[in-house]
């Protein structure tokens, strides 16, 4: 939950920035409905010869995917990864739902939207980064006020894998 604070501090030298908690979300494997390959871990992608749709190299979920593979003692080159990367989580889930891939790493809500199986592998905090002076301005305050409404909370609850109980909490207040 705090792995990004040092990156913000390093990148914001001379800038007054505030990091605001938005939500916690689950990242994991989006799997074909019913999980026909019986995938129960990231290691099963290789063992079960799953066709994997990955995100583009610069996507945060691709960086996380490569990290999770390394933790499991494997790498992307060991997998059957589709040539064309997914440009977003909806694209990734669509390819799995159409049978073009067996699995891919994305947020739980992408799997939920397409009625696919989901294997949670990582929980991460999603934050907003704003300049300190902007935090106190009307647009940011209106966004935070809207995000505290019942309608917003209901919509967040409908999106599987998101938790927003601490939304708006300042988790970093730059130098």
List each model region and its residues.
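N-terminal segment of the mature folded domain
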Residues: 1-35
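Hydrophobic residues within well-ordered alpha-helices
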Residues: 45, 65, 93-97
């Amino acid at each position: 939950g705090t792995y990004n604070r040092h990156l913000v501090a390093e990148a914001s030298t001379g800038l007054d920035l505030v990091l605001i908690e938005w939500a916690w979300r689950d990242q994991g494997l989006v799997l074909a409905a019913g999980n026909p390959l019986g995938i129960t871990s990231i290691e099963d992608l290789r063992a079960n010869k799953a066709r994997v749709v990955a995100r583009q190299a610069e996507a945060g979920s691709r960086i996380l995917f490569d990290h999770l593979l390394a933790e499991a003692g494997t790498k992307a080159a060991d997998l059957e990864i589709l040539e064309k990367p997914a440009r977003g989580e909806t694209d990734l889930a669509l390819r799995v739902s159409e049978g073009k891939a067996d699995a891919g790493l994305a947020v739980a809500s992408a799997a939920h939207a397409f009625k696919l199986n989901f294997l949670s592998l990582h929980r991460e905090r999603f934050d907003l980064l704003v300049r300190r002076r902007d935090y106190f301005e009307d647009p940011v305050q209106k966004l935070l006020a809207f995000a505290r409404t019942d309608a917003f909370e209901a919509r967040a609850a409908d999106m599987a894998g998101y938790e927003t109980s601490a939304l708006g909490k300042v988790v970093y207040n730059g130098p």
